[in-house]
Amino acid sequence: MSSYSESPKLPVREIPGDYGFPIISAIKDRYDYFYNQGEDAWFHGKAEKYKSTVVKINMAPGPFTSNDYKLVAFLDATSFVYMFDNTLIDKTDTLGGTFKPGKEYYGGYRPVAFVDTKDPNHAALKGYILSSFAKRHNLFIPLFRNSLSDHLFNDLEKQVSEQGKSDFNALLPNMTFGFIFRLLCDQTNPSDTVLGAQGPEHLRKWLFPQLIPSLSARKLPSFIEDLLFHNFLIPFGFVKSDYQKLVDAFSKSAVSMLDEAEKLGIKREEAVHNMLFLVGINMFAGLNAFFPHLIRFVGEAGPNLHTRLANEIRTAIKEEGGAITLSAINKMSLVKSVVYETLRLRPPVPLQYGKAKKDFMVQSHDASYKINKGQFLVGYNPMASRDPKIFANPDEFVPDRFMGDGEKMLKHVLWSNGRETENPAPENKQCAGKDLVQLLGRLILVEFFMRYDTFTVEITPLFRAPNVAIKTLTKATS
């Protein structure tokens, strides 16, 4: 990505905002962010209070998990994309925000997601991941379809029939983990390894202490949850045995991928720890955040959209002789648009962090602001992707927003740590699984509407991803 000009074209303003009293103000902001207001309202409130989309903030979790929580936030589409400029933004150890888990969580290595592009190791590791996906692209559709059939739809139908509804979120981990494991591990079934049936549980236990400082589980009284999870980092020892089982399983089963790493000059041990980070954070956590939003939006849209989707999907597949192929999926413009719209409204990773590599000027829609070298920065993707100066009805789910001439707006879809019109490469920080995530989103819709004409949902809001219950399933009649 080319560097942005450092010559401001708009009036220069001081960055508004106030960090307040040391520690006390940051803790108040943390309670507002997690409990009193919620993430979305908190960021919108800062922009409204200071009449600016570039503002100073105390970023949660703050004290005492981090000493560096005084950030500048980019809250519109114009300022947010500066976070993608690798000549300006250093991403070293900023993936999780203002705190970072110890290296022991990753076998003593730093996964590529924590490495800046200036590090020579970045291109080698990112290139390895991209080439691994490319070599397995023919497996994406058949393996995912099998996982959907074996670990999602059969259980959905059974639970709806017997219990009156099915917890969609609860069924996802086994389905997504099984797909990921078979994809990366030479089609080995995870239950045939040391993991048995507990693979998703070991993975969730390992992920929990890495993610919980920046989340709210909403299962405990706020003051207890805050005390336990937002004031210090959980030691690795609590999840060491879970992680070791994952390491053992992938080391023994992902033979081809690890052989490929060695041919590229990457140590087998380093490759397996990078693979586990890819599996856990990028794929497992990302997909389990994305799919509930997708099914929620489609479910709430109702029968009219369902009929349109079913007609498009079934027609495209019929034209392919009844086969669900990549060629057929690529013809489904409404399906594509629905997936893009979901990723626009609810990006799986809502926050992008980094530190300024040098002094530069950042522009919002109406002003320029000086960013000093070393300043810690955060971009809030849901506000950037719902910028009212870019999108009409920005907070509404518009299924066909990106159809026809609407495709021109794809450059403003920013969920992948890059523009939708750009591609991941060894020299950038864009999500290596960008195309795979979109394909799986389309494929789950294809499978839904090949089986069912319509369905209804019941939604329970959570901190970020909703809990989705499937209430009814009407089987396909044509």
Swiss-Prot record:
This is 9-divinyl ether synthase. Involved in the biosynthesis of the anti-fungal toxins colneleic acid and colnelenic acid. Belongs to the cytochrome P450 family. 9-divinyl ether synthase subfamily. It comes from Capsicum annuum. Keywords: Heme, Iron, Lyase, Metal-binding. One of its GO terms (molecular function) is heme binding. SUPFAM superfamilies: Cytochrome P450 (SSF48264). It catalyses: (9S)-hydroperoxy-(10E,12Z)-octadecadienoate = colneleate + H2O. Gene3D superfamilies: Cytochrome P450. Its EC number is 4.2.1.121. Pfam families: p450. InterPro entries: Cyt_P450, Cyt_P450_E_grp-IV, Cyt_P450_sf. Heme binds at residue 431. The keyword Cell membrane does not apply. It is an enzyme of class 4 (lyase). The keyword Protein biosynthesis does not apply.
